[in-house]
């Protein structure tokens, strides 16, 4: 990588000199057989496309420096599998013959006429394995996203694969998640400690494109202690963490969708609470809504809301108390 970086610096230098020294050099160039500039076999394209393309970026907000591809994994000359220009853009015979007056076979920009399937097929010819196995039936695949909706292959830094910048790429299309993740209680994505892809495989066909087959399995990859096994399970917890938590962010601490007692009273009775006795406040009626207004409410007593292991007292053990 370093070597190709230096190579490009030299190359740019050479071009600058070539420009200044004018026609004499241009004549020499014509005589010489074009050499590969970045990748083995790329001379068919780099005889015309060289670092001078960089001065006129074609994509409004990405500025692909065409030759910067030499500094990416796609520029590793030592690797026999490395693509050349034609592996992605096609042989483009017509384009070459007409000296750029017709389009290359595969053009990745949205304005280009190449259908999405053909653009993606160019990448998938080498990358259909691993994470991408489910691409065609993934939500993104079915929505006709192209690989280059997210990836910038010519840029030295591919924003979507860097922790600090990935979310920006997603937010271009996912405004609602931008809003959620910047709420007071959130997973540390904007802080750069984790990324959207910590939970999502955006090439995959799992539900909600999660990295695992279910929400719970995804959460357990980091919050193992919530998996149990517990002696007493709380049914909504084993069912779906998302019943109580909004994984991106909320205004309520602990990413909760609502505060106790309201959170609990979605399912548990508003107007009765058993064993209303000495330990419990003296309420006019045996009402959980009365209990809920006491201090921190339900969670003051039902502390092990994700599941309890207590075997001390069979009457309280199943109630997620210590
Ligand atoms: C004989 C010169 C020549 C050769 C050889 C050549 N091109 Fe081009 N190419 C051009 C010109 C001229 C343009 C139009 C100006 C521009 O957009 O930079 C162009 C434009 C392009 C574009 C942008 C098209 C658009 O509409 O945005 C791509 C992509 C491209 N060429 C890829 C390639 C590839 C890949 C090869 C090798 C297979 C290749 N070119 C070989 C001259 C050439
Ligand atoms: C790994 C696949 C791949 C390889 C290899 C590749 N390109 Fe590209 N090229 C793309 C994609 C994708 C874009 C769209 C912009 C981006 O993602 O950076 C693009 C954009 C371009 C553009 C700008 C026009 C546009 O559509 O935005 C030119 C010119 C170009 N490539 C020429 C080349 C040349 C010359 C080579 C060989 C040195 C080459 N490409 C190698 C995938 C590739
Ligand atoms: C001719 C084969 C080939 C084609 C076509 C190809 N790639 Fe690659 N790609 C590779 C190789 C080889 C590597 C480096 C080894 C690896 O990571 O597996 C790579 C690596 C990558 C990486 C990871 C880079 C890293 O730093 O780890 C991404 C992302 C990628 N390619 C995206 C694309 C996209 C998007 C396209 C289409 C525009 C594309 N590739 C087309 C062969 C190809
Ligand atoms: C919605 C945005 C998005 C789209 C669309 C997308 N990718 Fe990715 N890609 C990512 C992100 C994020 C990563 C890094 C995290 C990961 O590996 O899941 C990545 C990683 C990769 C890697 C390197 C990871 C590895 O396994 O080594 C390759 C290769 C790749 N993508 C190829 C593709 C191809 C091919 C397509 C089109 C079929 C595509 N991507 C479409 C966002 C995207
Ligand atoms: C070019 C636009 C675009 C970009 C960029 C993009 N997405 Fe999407 N994404 C979509 C569309 C379109 C859908 C389907 C409709 C919807 O749910 O909004 C979708 C759906 C999703 C879904 C829901 C999946 C499901 O099965 O319901 C997730 C999760 C997702 N995207 C994550 C991401 C992540 C993470 C990134 C960044 C790495 C990203 N997206 C980048 C367009 C995009
Ligand atoms: C902590 C794990 C986690 C992180 C980090 C995360 N997500 Fe999600 N995301 C989920 C889960 C779980 C769901 C499914 C929620 C559900 O079932 O309603 C989801 C759903 C989605 C959906 C579909 C929403 C819908 O209503 O169908 C989109 C789009 C999405 N996420 C985008 C993103 C983006 C963009 C990022 C990064 C800014 C991101 N996610 C980060 C876990 C996560
Ligand atoms: C990639 C690792 C990872 C995954 C996967 C993950 N989390 Fe987290 N989670 C974290 C980190 C890191 C924190 C922040 C801890 C801190 O700030 O001390 C956190 C914090 C939390 C918090 C406490 C927030 C607060 O305000 O302190 C809750 C609740 C939570 N996660 C729920 C979930 C749920 C539900 C899922 C599954 C949808 C999930 N997490 C998936 C890493 C992860
Ligand atoms: C019945 C609602 C509910 C469900 C379902 C639920 N949680 Fe929670 N979770 C809570 C409440 C309430 C808190 C706050 C606890 C407190 O304040 O003592 C919390 C706090 C957390 C915390 C941060 C504090 C801690 O205990 O580490 C994490 C992490 C967490 N939950 C993960 C999960 C995971 C993972 C799942 C799915 C396996 C899940 N939760 C399912 C209600 C729920
Ligand atoms: C999505 C619905 C739902 C939510 C929200 C919910 N629970 Fe539950 N909870 C249940 C179900 C279902 C059971 C099992 C009932 C049974 O076994 O009779 C249960 C059981 C319990 C039990 C044990 C009951 C017993 O008979 O052993 C307690 C205590 C409890 N929940 C407290 C809470 C608290 C406190 C909250 C709020 C933080 C809460 N629950 C939120 C559905 C929910
Ligand atoms: C002051 C402590 C305390 C508070 C506050 C409290 N509980 Fe309880 N809860 C208990 C005890 C103790 C039991 C076991 C009583 C028994 O089995 O006789 C119990 C039992 C339960 C049960 C099991 C009901 C059954 O039929 O067996 C549920 C459900 C429950 N509580 C939900 C809640 C909810 C929801 C809240 C908040 C609105 C709440 N509790 C607030 C102490 C408390």
Q: Over which residues does each language-model region extend?
A:
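Positively charged n-region of N-terminal signal peptides that target proteins for export
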Residues: 1-7
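Short sequence/structural segments immediately N-terminal
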Residues: 5, 19-322
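Bacterial N-terminal signal peptides
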Residues: 9-19
């Amino acid at each position: 990588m370093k070597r190709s970086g230096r190579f490009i610096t030299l190359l740019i230098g050479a071009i600058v000199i070539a420009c200044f020294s004018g026609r004499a050099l241009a004549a020499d160039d014509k005589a010489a057989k074009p050499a590969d500039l970045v990748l083995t076999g790329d001379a068919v394209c780099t005889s015309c496309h060289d670092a001078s393309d960089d001065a006129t970026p074609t994509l409004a907000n990405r500025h692909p420096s065409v030759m910067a591809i030499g500094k990416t994994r796609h520029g590793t000359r030592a690797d026999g599998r490395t693509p050349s220009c034609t592996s992605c853009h096609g042989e483009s015979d017509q384009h070459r013959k007409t000296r750029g007056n017709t389009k290359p076979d595969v053009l990745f920009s949205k304005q280009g006429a190449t259908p999405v399937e053909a653009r993606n097929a160019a990448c998938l010819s080498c990358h259909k394995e691993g994470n991408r196995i489910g691409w065609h039936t993934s939500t993104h695949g079915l929505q006709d996203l192209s690989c280059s909706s997210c990836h910038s292959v010519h840029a030295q830094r591919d924003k979507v694969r860097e922790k600090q910048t990935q979310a920006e790429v997603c937010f271009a299309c996912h405004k609602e998640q931008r809003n959620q993740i910047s709420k007071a209680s959130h997973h540390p994505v904007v802080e750069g400690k984790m990324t959207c892809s910590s939970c999502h495989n955006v090439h995959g066909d799992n539900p909600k494109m999660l990295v695992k087959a279910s929400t719970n399995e995804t959460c357990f990859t980091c919050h193992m202690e919530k998996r149990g096994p517990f002696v007493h399970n709380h049914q909504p917890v084993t069912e779906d963490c998302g019943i109580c938590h909004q994984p991106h962010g909320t205004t309520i601490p602990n990413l909760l969708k609502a505060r106790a007692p309201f959170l609990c009273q979605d399912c548990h009775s508003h107007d009765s609470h058993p064993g209303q006795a000495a330990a419990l406040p003296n309420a006019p009626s045996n009402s959980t809504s009365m209990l809920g207004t006491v201090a921190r409410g339900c969670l003051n007593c039902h502390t092990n809301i994700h599941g309890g292991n207590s075997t001390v007292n069979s009457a309280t053990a199943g109630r997620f108390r210590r």
